[in-house]
């Protein structure tokens, strides 16, 4: 069951990743080439000791903020895709995502928007995505970068802790299972 959960998650993440890449290649983002070149120059300058690490961080933060602000529409679309796929699809299909269907498992429990949202705070970083979009409008530059880095670190920590819980607990429950009251079960085979 552990391997099936991991496999289903990987299938789902790959599918969502492909959709996000397609969107990012279809929707134009302003100044991307210029900002990427600027980031490369900054990296070279810090590696050659031409600027201090503090100046590098400050300039990096400005570039990151501008890039994310210019791509907020794409970030919003990506967040919407995650919400639809990991919240709406399991409600409509009574517990399935494509990955879960392929490997023969599904969600069981009270499948509603709130419970699936709670579950996806841990597994997909949905809250981190939403908060990052909000931060674009309420902060800027170094504050924006610092807060999004902290959110990202917390998200990675949640995923790692939850993965170890699923690996080593006898009931296979991770943080997401406990806070959402939704469990992952094997589909009974019809004979």
Set out the residue ranges of the language-model regions.
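Short, small/hydrophobic-residue-rich motifs at membrane-helix boundaries and re-entrant hairpins
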Residues: 1-143, 147-165, 172-191
């Amino acid at each position: 069951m552990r391997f099936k959960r991991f496999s289903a998650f990987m299938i789902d993440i790959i599918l969502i990743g492909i959709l996000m890449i397609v969107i990012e290649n279809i929707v134009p983002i302003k100044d991307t080439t210029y900002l990427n070149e600027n980031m490369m120059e900054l990296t070279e300058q810090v590696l050659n000791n031409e600027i201090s690490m503090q100046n590098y961080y400050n300039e990096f933060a400005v570039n990151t903020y501008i890039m994310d602000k210019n791509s907020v529409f794409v970030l919003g679309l990506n967040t919407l895709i995650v919400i639809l796929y990991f919240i709406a699809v399991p409600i409509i299909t009574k517990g399935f995502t494509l990955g879960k269907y392929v490997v023969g498992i599904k969600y069981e429990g009270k499948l509603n928007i709130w419970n699936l949202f709670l579950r996806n705070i841990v597994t997909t970083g949905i809250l981190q995505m939403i908060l990052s979009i909000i931060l674009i409008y309420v902060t800027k530059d170094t504050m924006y970068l610092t807060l999004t880095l902290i959110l990202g670190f917390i998200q990675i920590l949640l995923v790692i802790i939850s993965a170890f819980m699923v690996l080593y607990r006898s009931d296979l429950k991770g943080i997401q299972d406990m806070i959402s009251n939704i469990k992952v079960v094997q589909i009974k085979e019809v004979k």
